Every structure is written in C-alpha cells, then in structure tokens.
Amino acid sequence: MRVLGIDPGIAIVGYSILDYDNNKIKCLEYGCITTSSKSALPDRLSFIYQEMNKIIDEFQPDDCAFEELFFNKNVKTAITVSQARGVEILSCINKDLRLYEYTPLQIKQAVVGYGRADKRQVQETVKTILKFNEIPKPDDAADAVAVALCHIFGSKFKYLNEMK
C-alpha cells in the first residue's frame, strides 16, 4: 500500500509518500507545496492543484490521508484553508484515490500512543519509526508523515476513517 499523507494548508501544504509492504514502512518522499501570500487566491489554488497532481502522478499512491482541519477563531483563515483543502481533495478524487481523514488526537494516538502528545513527541516518534537521521522539516512535512503513519497503523487494525 502506498499512502499520500497531507497536512492541508494554503501557504504551506505538507505532503509525504510512504510505502507499507510486508510489515515494513518506507518513506519515499516528504516535503511542502508553498504559495506566496502576495499571489491572488485563485492562482494559489491552481498552483496547489497542479503540484498535487504532479506528486500523485509521480508516486501513484493508493490512499490519501488528510489531517482534519481545526480552527479556533479566525474565520477568514478557516475559509481560505478550507478552499485549499477542497482543491487538495479534488486532485485526489480526480486520480481515483481512496480518501481518509484523521483528527490530531487520532494521529497522536496512532503514532505516539498518547492522544495528548505534543508536537515534539510526535516528531521524535516519526524520526524513530522511519529511522530518519533528523526530524523532517518543516513542521508541515513532519505532520504529513505522521498522518500517513496514522493511516498505515490504522489499516493494520482496520481502523480507517474513510472520508464521507
């Protein structure tokens, strides 16, 4: 199984590609799609869509796992990021990927074993599991790796949150 992990965003979209085969997990790539706040929103969304398509075409994942969005206060930011997330989902749908989403609590529970783990604990665990020399940077990429790991660990136990 090949998983595309996504940490949704408009300025920075974290992504990762993990392979899971014979109980072995291998990270093929992780990184970020970045857009400039100086660019018009339609241009930013178009760029994200194009870059997502390139990643999907290159790596041919089976599943796509998203971190569920959570916003506290800023409605304008929530709307803009939600629009970007819609574009990210659309690129996966157009490539016939199965879509799943996980809450931050589920991701922390799956990766660290504790749903209230802090960001640093999650990053250190990701580094250990995948035998990285250092924590993936930036944080958005590390989050995307954690999302993909959550999906892989969930698949072992048939604990998959298929997007409705």
Swiss-Prot record:
Active site: D7, E67, D140
Residues reported to bind Mg(2+) 2: E67
UniProt cofactor note: Binds 2 Mg(2+) ion per subunit.
Cofactor(s), names only, from the UniProt record: Mg(2+)
Main localization of the protein described in the UniProt heading: cytoplasm
Catalytic activity: Endonucleolytic cleavage at a junction such as a reciprocal single-stranded crossover between two homologous DNA duplexes (Holliday junction)
GO cellular component: cytoplasm; Holliday junction resolvase complex
Gene Ontology MF annotations: crossover junction DNA endonuclease activity; DNA binding; magnesium ion binding
Keywords per UniProt: Cytoplasm, DNA damage, DNA recombination, DNA repair, DNA-binding, Endonuclease, Hydrolase, Magnesium, Metal-binding, Nuclease
Cellular localisation: Cytoplasm
GO biological process: one example: DNA repair
Domain of life: Bacteria
Enzyme class: hydrolase
Record-linked NCBIfam families: PRK00039.2-1, ruvC
Family according to the record: Belongs to the RuvC family.
Binding partners and assembly: Homodimer which binds Holliday junction (HJ) DNA. The HJ becomes 2-fold symmetrical on binding to RuvC with unstacked arms; it has a different conformation from HJ DNA in complex with RuvA. In the full resolvosome a probable DNA-RuvA(4)-RuvB(12)-RuvC(2) complex forms which resolves the HJ.
Entry protein name: Crossover junction endodeoxyribonuclease RuvC
Organism: Finegoldia magna (strain ATCC 29328 / DSM 20472 / WAL 2508) (Peptostreptococcus magnus)
Gene symbol of the encoding locus: ruvC
